[in-house]
């Protein structure tokens, strides 16, 4: 009995495609989704964000932290 190997479907980047949200450092509700409960940036292999958009996202999160819109760490 031959088993087929488990096929994991590739997730699609939430920031690519039509009517995708723009990455903006002032949009804290959107950025909060990509930060862990400890305040760290969640890696793209978990969130399925493309490499280019992950860099934009990280830059926006760091900008928002600098302007005190988001916390650096959560206790």
UniProtKB/Swiss-Prot annotation:
GO BP: any one term: translation
Q: How does it assemble?
A: Part of the 30S ribosomal subunit. Forms a tight heterodimer with protein bS6.
Q: Which GO terms describe its molecular function?
A: small ribosomal subunit rRNA binding; structural constituent of ribosome
Which Pfam families does the record cross-reference, listed alphabetically? Ribosomal_S18
What is the name of this protein?
Small ribosomal subunit protein bS18
The family annotation for this protein states: Belongs to the bacterial ribosomal protein bS18 family.
Supply the Gene3D superfamilies for this chain. Answer: Ribosomal protein S18
Q: Which GO terms describe its cellular component?
A: cytosolic small ribosomal subunit
Top-level taxonomic group: Bacteria
Gene that this sequence comes from: rpsR
Question: Its biological function?
Answer: Binds as a heterodimer with protein bS6 to the central domain of the 16S rRNA, where it helps stabilize the platform of the 30S subunit.
Q: Which UniProt keywords apply?
A: Ribonucleoprotein, Ribosomal protein, RNA-binding, rRNA-binding
């Amino acid at each position: 009995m031959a088993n087929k190997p488990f096929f994991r479907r590739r997730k699609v980047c939430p920031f690519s495609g039509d009517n995708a949200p723009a990455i903006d450092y002032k949009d804290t509700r959107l950025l909060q989704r990509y930060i862990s409960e400890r305040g760290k940036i969640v890696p793209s292999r978990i969130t399925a964000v493309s490499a280019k958009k992950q860099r934009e996202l990280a830059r926006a999160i760091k900008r928002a932290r600098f302007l005190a819109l988001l916390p650096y760490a959560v206790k």
